[in-house]
Amino acid sequence: MALQQIVEQTVAGLGYDLVEIERSAGGLLRITIDLVWVPPTDEVSAAVGAEQFITVEDCEKVTRQLQFALEVEGVDYTRLEVSSPGIDRLLRNEADFKRFEGEVIDITLKQPMGAAAGGQVHANRKKFRGALERADSGGWQIVWSDEPPVKPGQRISKKRVPAPLQALGFTLDELREARLAPIVDFKGRGTKPGEPG
């Protein structure tokens, strides 16, 4: 049985989602897991499960089970690491894009924009950061503004005209990689978007 298959079966059997498998030099086998996402319904609000994360105990449980499975299958590795996806989680399929719709993501295209850029962005550009949205055509798009972020304490002129939003539509086949943007706010816990506060 192939490594991917062994790990997927073991992780799914324990009730987790396999995000990524990485083999590194020196025999390191790194497995990234996450909780299985269930799309919100009328009965289950989107807020339920939003604060659930992979714990150390989850990683320990998967590690123990994988050690047995990999030994039985004769997979050669020196060290096994099981971890949560972190703040820059890889987005690999349609379900991941649905789950993180509205979040800021970083994408890398397989090919540069070329003539399709139409002078809006540099023709050789392949990397973009923006809010993930569902496109009208049924695909996906990211929306961003090239306006620099406002610094804390900076005064904003009332006459200032905000930079226009730009959008880039794409299909999953056009992506080399997509990840959640690692944006960290060190100011403490604020209110979530959409909450009064």
From Swiss-Prot:
One of its GO terms (biological process) is ribosomal small subunit assembly. Keywords: Cytoplasm, Ribosome biogenesis. Gene3D superfamilies: RimP-like superfamily, N-terminal. Coiled coil: none annotated. It is found in: Cytoplasm. GO terms for cellular component: cytosol. InterPro entries: Ribosome_maturation_RimP (IPR003728), RimP_C (IPR028998), RimP_C_sf (IPR036847), RimP_N (IPR028989), RimP_N_sf (IPR035956). It comes from the Bacteria. Belongs to the RimP family. This is Ribosome maturation factor RimP. It comes from Acidovorax sp. (strain JS42). The gene is rimP.
